């Protein structure tokens, strides 16, 4: 999954940003769980998810 473009994210409302952050945090939790149980994972997803969460939280702060 490719990273979202900032131009696409800027069109989101605060509620949509909150929902997307929650979704990404759940995905990050699931990845950590898979790693702990020795399942096959894609290590680069950790960085991508954290990066996208940071982008969303930055946009939320700017909109407030």
From Swiss-Prot:
GO cellular component, one term: cytosolic large ribosomal subunit
Gene3D superfamilies (alphabetical): 1.10.287.310
InterPro entries: Ribosomal_protein_uL29, Ribosomal_uL29, Ribosomal_uL29_CS, Ribosomal_uL29_sf
SUPFAM superfamilies: Ribosomal protein L29 (L29p)
CDD domains (UniProt xref): Ribosomal_L29_HIP (cd00427)
PROSITE patterns the record matches: RIBOSOMAL_L29
One MF annotation (Gene Ontology) recorded for this entry: structural constituent of ribosome
Record keywords, A-Z: Ribonucleoprotein, Ribosomal protein
One example of a Gene Ontology biological process annotation: translation
UniProt record similarity statement: Belongs to the universal ribosomal protein uL29 family.
NCBIfam families the record matches: L29
Name of the protein: Large ribosomal subunit protein uL29
The organism of origin for this protein: Acaryochloris marina (strain MBIC 11017)
Higher taxonomy: Bacteria, Bacillati, Cyanobacteriota, Cyanophyceae, Acaryochloridales
């Amino acid at each position: 999954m490719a990273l979202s473009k900032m131009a696409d994210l800027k069109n989101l409302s605060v509620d949509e940003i909150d929902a997307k952050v929650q979704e990404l945090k759940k995905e990050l939790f699931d990845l950590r769980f898979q790693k702990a149980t020795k399942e096959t994972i894609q290590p680069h997803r950790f960085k991508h998810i954290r990066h996208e969460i940071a982008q969303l939280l930055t946009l939320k702060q700017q909109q407030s």
